[in-house]
Amino acid sequence: MIVEALNNPFDAEFNKVSSDKSISHRCAIFSLLSDKVSKISNYLEAEDTMNSLKIIEKLGAKVEFKNGVYLITPPKKIVSPNAILECGNSGTAMRIFMGLLAGCDGFFVLSGDKYLNERPMKRVASPLMQIGAKIDGRDCANKAPLAIRGGELNYFAYNSSVASAQVKTALILAGLCSAGCKFKEPELSRDHSERMLLGMGAQISQSGLEIEVKPLKGAYLKPLILDVPNDPSSCFFYAVAAAIIPGSKIIIKNILLNKTRIEAYKVLEKMGAKITYTKTSSTYEDIGDICVQYSELKSVDVNQNISWLIDEAPALAIAFACANGVSTLKNAKELRVKECDRIAITVAALKKCGIEAVELEDGFSIKGGKPNSATIDSHGDHRIAMSFAILGLKCGMNIEKSEFIATSFPKFSYFLRELGARVED
């Protein structure tokens, strides 16, 4: 992908941008817990989320698309498929399906692309195995392909060492489908699963950082009836664009306003960007509009609520690179085990653009400056590719392996062009 620098500021308003990826995955997976048809509109039609629909079909669900709505009819009982369950590039799908299938009768094999199959899965596999799950795979069940022999699991209480919505969701599902559980995390991670499952009728209670889950015991949850809002993580790229291109402004409508999903916007606000939030509705989640206007950015130190902005870290690095002073991100070691080592790759790419950047063990330090045009290897990481495309609006950029953007945001280039950018895919 080649992105040319913008010659003029932009003033844009986006309505349907990119449906929320986290919620779309969960809509597909959680629909299996009901005995009635779930109706999902505005489902994200990206490679990863469409793979989740294909997986639930292999598990016995019927998926239809009618008049812009996905109708998901769950099976009476999850079936043991005769094919591998392909998760593509999605760690979210693989980890959540692990939790669900560990407590279901049957034999299941989860696999992904060459990047996903090198990512660590032990953080989910280990606690599941401690409560009786039968999981095997490469590197002692740390790497996919993973074979799961599902069955009844024991009640468990688990203290997680990481704040991860994926780990939490996997263990909540394992508890729901077996004997129940208690789960505690070191800090609050994104909470879509609890909100959605509570809305479906699950018995989940929370006290501080601890969640208690009552088992379904053969009962079913209510179906999901949901219009998936815009994804704040995907939309954040355009928020950064507005914040770094002088005179620019963007309004993003129908966007998820969950506090665990807009932390990166709060950081951008602390840096000086003018941002307003307007809530327009609330069903499972608060939904509304976000307006971002350019203002000269100042440096910031970020070391709290990291799990709330972990996906936006590469895009935040672009804002850091365009700010006055030295900005730091810490307590983000999780970035080392994403689609690539996002700390090392982000720092190396910024250096190629003439920006002073330093790797920290758990983050990075970036001195803002005037970036240069460069050729960047995204290492097959969709968020690295999109982040440096945004920097390209300021100085021009050539991004290699940009085809992986389609795993999460197929229309990314379309909306860049809507800002006035010249883009060659």
UniProtKB/Swiss-Prot annotation:
GO CC annotations on file: cytoplasm
Pathway annotation: Metabolic intermediate biosynthesis; chorismate biosynthesis; chorismate from D-erythrose 4-phosphate and phosphoenolpyruvate: step 6/7
InterPro entries membership: Enolpyruvate_Tfrase_dom (IPR001986), Enolpyruvate_Tfrase_sf (IPR036968), EPSP_synthase (IPR006264), EPSP_synthase_CS (IPR023193), RNA3'P_cycl/enolpyr_Trfase_a/b (IPR013792)
Main location: cytoplasm
GO biological process terms held by the UniProt record: amino acid biosynthetic process; aromatic amino acid family biosynthetic process; chorismate biosynthetic process
CDD domains noted in UniProt: EPSP_synthase
EC number(s) reported in the record: 2.5.1.19
Positions of the catalytic residues: 311 (proton acceptor)
Reaction catalysed by this enzyme: 3-phosphoshikimate + phosphoenolpyruvate = 5-O-(1-carboxyvinyl)-3-phosphoshikimate + phosphate
Pfam families: EPSP_synthase
MF terms (GO), sorted A to Z: 3-phosphoshikimate 1-carboxyvinyltransferase activity
Compartment annotation: Cytoplasm
Keywords for this protein: Amino-acid biosynthesis, Aromatic amino acid biosynthesis, Cytoplasm, Transferase
Residues given in the record as phosphoenolpyruvate binding sites: 21, 91, 119, 166, 342, 383
Gene3D superfamilies: Enolpyruvate transferase domain (3.65.10.10)
Binding site for 3-phosphoshikimate: 21-22, 26, 164, 166, 311, 338
Its job: Catalyzes the transfer of the enolpyruvyl moiety of phosphoenolpyruvate (PEP) to the 5-hydroxyl of shikimate-3-phosphate (S3P) to produce enolpyruvyl shikimate-3-phosphate and inorganic phosphate.
UniProt record similarity statement: Belongs to the EPSP synthase family.
Stored NCBIfam families: aroA
Subunit structure: Monomer.
Name assigned to this protein: 3-phosphoshikimate 1-carboxyvinyltransferase
Species for this entry: Campylobacter fetus subsp. fetus (strain 82-40)
